[in-house]
From Swiss-Prot:
Details of cofactor binding: Binds 1 heme b (iron(II)-protoporphyrin IX) group per dimer.
Native organism: Persephonella marina (strain DSM 14350 / EX-H1)
Gene Ontology biological process terms from the UniProt entry: cellular response to hydrogen peroxide; hydrogen peroxide catabolic process
Top EC category: oxidoreductase
GO cellular component term of the entry, any: cytosol
Active site location: H96 (proton acceptor)
UniProt name for this protein: Catalase-peroxidase
Alphabetical list of SUPFAM superfamilies matching this protein: Heme-dependent peroxidases
The protein's assembly and partners: Homodimer or homotetramer.
Length: 727
């Protein structure tokens, strides 16, 4: 043989690029437990004791800002800056990092810095933002672990605004980087860029999605599906920004404020001249995508969206010119050199001509996008736009607040914000909780309060159910929810269907205990929020004693109660669970397999697979089911913390048969010999015996030598959930 062969074919190594998904190809609907194993510590290169909050505190924050400012003003030959300033590019980078947030599930957003990873790094709406991050690399290299990419991208947007004359209201750090793509975020059903399969027959975006097409951050700037329909674009804007959690005023402020800066890039047809996106680019491009073969491929020949031109004659200066020009002129529909629909001013005055970004002395008429004209022609959007036009200071303030909300929405409660520029003002979207101005309870108080709680009319089941109901509203995606604030006693949570079981009774008892304790003359007080957790912990300890073990359940005080006035009812309504497999609850109208929803819930609670297993098994034997059903209560000793759920689920003397009850899959377990009905369970219950990976966990915890191990693991997982919102 003249040609040497290695003895293998490429097919032998496809696992290296398919991510181990060969099993899922055989069984595409099997549970994906990898969702609960993201950012495995073995993947993260930091030392095990690394603490980002501590590292950030060592940062010379204002020196960092100065370095970012210097980078923005130093145009690089490999990617020349428009108008000699990278500010508009950095604003777009920050905006597109934060703008993926959607309020329904809290996913997307700037936290984690997922713009660096697939699929977001390769979306058509993010063309050339890889260059923005490369421009920032010298800064990231210099400051290292003290500043995450997630924080740096947002801070760069802030510095850009400030360097172009805008006064922001501040910045909060604290976003920690992820180290792999997020596989728990649903970006849509489409398999092609800019495809649209996400709208219902009524034209609404289905599910939690906020963007109108695959690969966009929010709306299509050319109009719905690329058609220059201004009023259709207005409808898209309101829905898309609304699902990002923005009001109409905030929406107009963000569009008008953002388009005060920079330009669009469409020197030629992107489908003809742009190479593959970063994830598909050849190895020698080192992660840079969209290589441009038109002309020089940069500067005046840049291709990004395919739209071409700038909005104002002052594209690197904050002013009111975007709105002034929008309302001053009539607009002609034209196509850009790249073939994209846009609007050009009719007979613009000389002083309103836009300077070329790279050729001195050359000028162009200002342009508007279809979505921009929506701010003028849609009555609701136009009313706000005119108010901003007439009152530039009001506009400035509205944009400053909307920008801060956009870039901080998924960072969580204000106590998580880091740095010297955190604004003092509280905003309703931060879910504010008053600061504690009293002395916290001590160990003696905790002991006495536990005794009072356990002597009350509330049962172990009721106390556990209520504590779980409050704590399990937490979602890691945007750090909202949880016990802190005591919002389970406020609207909308107190009226949720799932909270009608046990919760009102327990809250009444705990409020009486709270009022009695707080009558004492000292400065010491206890909040309802702390009492809810303490009651749950006391109940779990009692259940452990009944099992014959003496194991302490940790409790740390420090939660406070908030008010109805500080609670945005509409915003909090999105935290109502469609399903909570831990309480064996699902809304009747939901037809998604319950085990899928269990995995999503466990992911939002930041649980590992073993933690999810012990919590389900433990909550079942404690009887903590919605509506007090017996589903999954595989024990004769309800209220005793034991591994009975797993033992009896795996008992081969029981045979399971499916039935439909109230439009729900229920399974009845019969004694193989007698034919007697023994237990009933849901899909969530039986999945622990059906799924091979979960069965392995169930077998482990069902072992005779792991009875105490099960209890200790339950306590650890319980403690984790109770404290998710304060750690």
């Amino acid at each position: 043989m003249d040609k040497k062969e290695c003895g293998f074919s490429i097919d032998d190594f496809l696992y290296a690029v398919e991510g181990g998904n060969t099993i899922s190809k055989w069984w595409p609907h099997r549970l994906n437990l990898k969702i609960l194993q993201q950012n495995n510590p073995d993947l993260v290169p930091f030392d095990k004791n690394f603490n980002y909050r501590e590292e950030f505190s060592k940062l010379d924050y204002f020196e960092l800002k100065e370095d970012i400012r210097r980078i923005m003003r130093e145009s690089q030959e490999w990617w020349p800056a428009d108008y000699g300033h990278y500010g508009p590019l950095f604003i777009r980078m920050a905006w597109h990092s934060a703008g993926t947030y959607r309020i329904i599930d809290g996913k997307g957003g700037a936290n984690g810095g997922n713009q660096r990873f697939a699929p977001v790094n390769s979306w058509p709406d993010n063309v050339n933002l890889d260059r923005a991050r490369r421009l920032l690399w010298p800064v990231k290299k210099k400051y290292g672990n003290k500043i995450s990419w997630a924080d740096l991208m947002i801070l760069a947007g802030n510095v850009a605004l400030e360097d172009m004359g805008f006064k922001t209201i501040g910045f909060g750090g604290g976003r920690e980087d992820i180290w792999e793509p997020e596989i728990d975020t649903y970006w849509g059903p489409e398999t092609e860029w800019l495809a649209d399969m996400r709208h219902s027959e009524e034209g609404k975006i289905k599910g939690p999605l906020a963007a109108v097409q695959m690969g966009l951050i929010y709306v299509n700037p050319e109009g719905p599906n690329g058609e220059p329909d201004v009023l259709g674009a207005a409808k898209d804007i309101k829905e898309s920004f609304g699902k990002m959690g923005m009001s109409i005023e905030e929406t107009v402020a963000l569009i008008a404020g953002g388009h005060t800066f920079g330009k669009c890039h469409g020197a030629a047809d992107p489908s003809k001249y742009l190479g593959p996106e970063p994830e598909a680019a050849p190895i020698e491009q080192q992660g840079l995508g969209w290589k441009n073969s038109y002309g020089t491929g940069k500067g005046k020949d840049t291709i990004t969206s395919g739209l071409e031109g700038a909005w104002t004659p002052t594209p690197i200066k904050w002013d009111n010119s975007f709105l002034r020009i929008l309302f001053k002129y009539e607009w002609n529909l034209q196509k850009s050199p790249a073939g994209a629909w846009q609007w050009v001013a009719v007979n613009p005055d000389r002083e309103d001509l836009v300077p070329d970004a790279h050729i001195p002395g050359k000028y162009h008429p200002p342009i508007m996008l279809t979505t921009d004209l929506a701010l003028k022609l849609d009555p609701e959007l136009s009313e706000v736009s005119k108010r901003f036009l007439e009152d530039p200071e009001y506009f400035r303030d509205a944009f400053a607040k909307a920008w801060f909300k956009l870039t901080h929405r998924d960072l969580g409660p204000k106590w998580r914000y880091l740095g010297p520029e955190v604004p003092e003002e509280d905003f309703i979207w931060q879910d504010p909780i008053p600061e504690i101005n009293y002395q916290l309870i001590d160990q003696d108080d905790i002991k006495n309060l536990k005794e009072k709680i356990l002597k009350s009319d509330a049962t172990v089941t009721e106390l556990v159910y209520t504590a779980w109901s409050a704590a399990s509203t937490f979602r890691k995606s945007d750090r909202r929810g949880g016990v802190n604030g005591g919002r389970i006693a406020l609207e909308p949570q107190i009226s949720w269907e799932v909270n009608k079981t046990h919760v009102p009774k327990v809250l009444k008892i705990l409020n009486e205990i709270k009022e009695d304790f707080n009558k004492q003359s000292s400065d010491k007080k206890v909040s309802l929020a702390d009492l809810i957790v303490l009651a749950g912990c006391a109940a779990v300890e009692e259940a452990i004693k009944r099992a014959g073990f003496d194991i302490q359940v940790p409790f740390r005080p420090g939660r406070n109660d908030t008010t109805q006035e500080l609670t945005d009812i509409k915003s909090f309504s999105f935290l109502e669970p469609v399903a909570d497999g831990f309480r064996n609850y699902i809304k009747p109208e939901c037809d998604i397999p319950e085990e899928y929803l269990l995995i999503d819930k466990a992911d939002q609670l930041n649980l590992t697979v073993p933690q999810m297993c012990v919590l389900v098994g433990g909550l079942r034997v404690l009887g903590a089911n919605y509506d007090s059903t017996d589903y999954g209560v595989f024990t004769d000793n309800v209220g005793t913390l034991s591994n009975d759920f797993f033992v009896n689920l795996l008992d081969m003397s029981i045979v399971w048969k499916p039935v439909r009850v109230n439009n729900r899959d229920i399974f009845e377990g019969y004694d193989r010999k007698t034919g007697d009905l023994v237990y009933r369970g849901t899909r969530v219950d039986l999945i622990f015996g059906s799924n091979s990976e979960l069965r392995a966990q169930a077998e482990f915890y069902a072992q005779d030598d792991n009875r105490e191990k099960f209890i200790r693991d339950f306590v650890e997982a319980w403690d984790k959930v109770m404290n998710l919102d304060i750690t």
